[in-house]
Regions:
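Paired small-residue
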Residues: 6, 77-84, 92-101, 291-299
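Helix-breaking motifs and short loop linkers at transmembrane-helix boundaries and internal kinks
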Residues: 34, 66, 87-93, 232, ...
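Conserved MFS/SLC helix-loop-helix module at the cytosolic interface between two early adjacent transmembrane helices
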Residues: 53-92
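Helix-to-loop junctions at the C-terminal end of transmembrane segments
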Residues: 55-67, 252-264, 353
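Cytoplasmic helix-loop-helix junction between adjacent transmembrane helices
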Residues: 97-136
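Intracellular juxtamembrane helix-capping segments at the cytosolic ends
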Residues: 108-120, 306-322
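C-terminal membrane-cytosol helix-exit motif in multi-pass small-molecule transporters
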Residues: 164-184, 376-379
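A late C-terminal transmembrane helix in Major Facilitator Superfamily
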Residues: 321-356
Length: 400
């Protein structure tokens, strides 16, 4: 794989750490800022909303900016946002910092996905996207547990300072490794690019993404409280459990990419979503047992991110058919869909916790993922009806 993909993965590592470390710090932040656990959970939703707004709008507005220059600018914005979080004196300031970093996140992953697919032959597109998103999974393996440890022992502000340092490292890595001659979309007007919202098949993919991730985050947002209050883990060991989850996620992400390359994204997604439904249902019964919940979290990690390569490569392929003038924007809208799902899942999870309790989140999340599975099955049927092949023919990488 090209070195540029590793540069993208390095940036994704920094972004993934700041996105997901908040899950392990929710109880700590709630106690520090004197807010409720559901209120602290809104920090997940606000970040996701920043991504959802920033991804399509800023991607469309920056369509004429050279890709490498844009990547570097985004990482600078990301680093500044984490510095604001480090210095945040109260809950409102921390919320603003989360939105700011979310704006950078959305555009990074939208253009990063299309860059990744253009660096390799087309039949390796899902694996290339998986490699870039490996940065997120490695963040779960190392960044999130370490960040959780730092936050619990040195204050949550110290975690964001550490992530700012990661941002600087990512800027240097991208400046050195990302080439300047990557092919982008042909320049087009903002209205032309946003016309992807009129494409029913793309809207179907966005709905698949929103439900698939929304269902997961109904439960995942409150994993730390479940581990502490239901399973009986000490707060100091939550980071270790997140490490177990992250190791499994790293394997699942690569596995999901290879599955999508081998069998096509739709078939891969059907399999992954079905497994995710099963794991969330099992969690409803295993949470009170420390050994069993550890095994369930391990299985959860293996499928939780296994759908990312398939969803992202599928939206790129659909956009190349339905909106070839706005592939980056179509990709960005799928990043927005991921984060709309995260925001709605975290918000809905808070309502569920407040009214039904923590242990209602896994089985309700499973029901939402069933919706994603049904929509994926519909997408596959429509592809077969239209004669769309499950896997593309070989096409060389695209450079200027």
């Amino acid at each position: 794989m090209p070195l540029a993909l590793w540069a993208l993965a390095l940036s994704a590592f920094a972004i993934g750490t700041t996105e997901f470390v908040i899950v392990g710090l929710i109880p700590t932040i709630a106690a520090s800022l004197n807010v409720s656990v559901p209120s602290a959970g809104l920090l997940v939703s606000l970040y996701a909303l920043g991504v959802a707004v920033g991804a399509p709008v800023l991607t469309a507005l920056t369509g004429r900016v050279p890709r490498k220059r844009l990547l570097l600018a985004l990482m600078v914005l990301f680093t500044l946002g984490n510095l604001v979080a480090w210095m945040a004196p109260n809950y409102a300031a921390l919320m603003a910092a989360r939105v700011l970093t979310g704006l950078a996140h959305g555009v990074f992953f939208s253009i990063g996905s299309t860059i990744a697919t253009r660096l390799v032959p087309k039949e390796q597109a899902a694996s290339a996207i998986a490699l870039m998103f490996t940065g997120l999974t490695v963040a779960l393996v190392t960044g999130v547990p370490i960040g959780t440890f730092i936050g619990q022992h040195f204050g949550w502000q110290a975690t964001f300072l550490a992530v700012s340092v990661l941002g600087v490292v990512a800027i240097v890595g991208s400046a050195i490794l990302v080439p300047s001659d990557i092919a982008g979309d042909q320049p087009s007007s903002l209205l032309t690019q946003l016309a992807v919202l009129k494409k029913p098949r793309l809207l179907l993919v966005y709905a698949m993404t929103t439900l698939g991730y929304g269902g997961t985050f109904i439960a995942f947002t409150y994993l730390a409280p479940i581990l502490q209050e239901v399973a009986g883990f000490e707060a100091s060991t939550v980071g270790l459990v997140m490490l177990v989850y992250g190791v499994s996620v790293a394997a699942g992400n690569i596995w999901g990419g290879r599955l999508a390359d081998r069998h096509g994204p739709v078939r891969a997604l059907q399999f992954v979503f079905a497994l995710l439904v099963l794991v969330l249902l099992v969690l409803s019964f295993t949470a009170p047992s420390k050994p069993l919940v550890l095994l369930t979290v391990l299985a959860w990690g293996a499928v939780a991110f296994g759908n990312v390569p398939g969803l992202q490569v599928y939206v790129v392929r659909r956009a190349e058919r339905d909106a070839p003038q706005a592939v980056d924007v179509a990709s960005s809208l799928n990043i927005a869909a991921f984060n709309v799902g995260i925001a709605l899942g975290a918000w809905g999870g808070g309502l569920i916790v407040a009214h039904l309790g923590l242990m209602a989140t896994p089985w309700i999340g499973a029901l939402v993922v069933v919706g994603a599975l049904l929509l994926t099955t519909l997408a596959g049927w429509l592809d077969r009806r239209d004669g769309v092949p499950a896997k593309p023919a070989r096409i060389a990488p695209q450079f200027n």
